[in-house]
């Protein structure tokens, strides 16, 4: 068990679609509440799958959150009473790749615990640059796995489907959706975008 320090830190929860990233984020935030620490959570405006203004896991767990367009919007919502800052679906924010690293490092340097969740790879199995940069400087990185819908192995890839077939390589990188558009797949069952 990792003992949390009293100083600032960055924690990253990553993985493919349906790996339980938001559920794990909500679990950690519930522990923060039990410790009577004040928190603020953020969710991207682009994430329209569930309730705007809430972090919502695929199994229905939820936490109230502020809606933002950019990671740079987070400091404006903070006050001196906040101990923990949480950001869900980081890869959906409209920012240059280094913005998340800069903002999260600044918050951690100010003594805050920063917990970020998001996809580590896009549907092409390429790293999301913002997540990759943040993972490099985080004190803790937890990669979660889903179950491959094809063979039952641990899944590490998000297969985007269009009419039941893998999306082409030139499809937009960001398309918000759930089981109607994506499947969790292992390396062997993943079909590269062409």
Swiss-Prot record:
Q: Which residues bind Zn(2+)?
A: 148, 151, 186, 189
What EC number(s) is this enzyme filed under?
2.7.1.21
What PROSITE patterns does the annotation carry? TK_CELLULAR_TYPE (PS00603)
What InterPro entries does the database record attribute to this sequence? P-loop_NTPase, Thymidine_kinase, Thymidine_kinase_CS
Q: Which GO terms describe its biological process?
A: DNA biosynthetic process; thymidine metabolic process
Task: Please list the residues that make up the active site.
Answer: 89 (proton acceptor)
Which key words tag this protein in UniProt? Answer: ATP-binding, Cytoplasm, DNA synthesis, Kinase, Metal-binding, Nucleotide-binding, Transferase, Zinc
Query: May I have one GO cellular component term?
Result: cytosol
Please write the reaction equations for the catalytic activity of this protein. thymidine + ATP = dTMP + ADP + H(+)
Family the entry assigns: Belongs to the thymidine kinase family.
Q: Which NCBIfam families match?
A: PRK04296.1-1 (NF003296)
Summary of subunit composition and partner proteins: Homotetramer.
Its recorded name reads: Thymidine kinase
Say which species the protein is native to. Answer: Roseiflexus castenholzii (strain DSM 13941 / HLO8)
């Amino acid at each position: 068990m990792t003992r949390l320090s009293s100083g600032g830190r960055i924690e990253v929860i990553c993985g493919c679609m349906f790996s339980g990233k938001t559920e794990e984020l909500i679990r950690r935030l519930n522990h923060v509440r039990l410790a009577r620490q004040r928190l603020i959570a953020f969710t991207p405006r682009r994430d329209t799958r569930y309730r705007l203004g809430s972090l919502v896991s695929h199994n229905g767990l939820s936490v109230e959150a502020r809606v933002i367009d950019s990671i740079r919007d987070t400091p404006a919502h903070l006050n001196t009473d906040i101990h923990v800052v949480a950001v869900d679906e980081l890869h959906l924010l409209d920012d240059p790749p280094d913005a998340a690293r800069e903002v999260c490092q600044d918050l951690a340097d100010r003594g805050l615990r920063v917990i970020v969740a998001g996809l580590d790879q896009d549907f092409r199995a390429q790293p999301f640059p913002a997540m990759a940069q943040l993972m490099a400087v985080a004190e803790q990185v937890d990669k979660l796995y889903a179950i491959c819908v094809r063979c039952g192995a641990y899944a590490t890839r998000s297969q985007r489907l269009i009419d039941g077939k893998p999306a082409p390589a030139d499809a937009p990188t960001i398309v918000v959706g759930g089981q109607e558009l994506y499947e969790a797949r292992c390396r062997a069952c993943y079909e590269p975008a062409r």
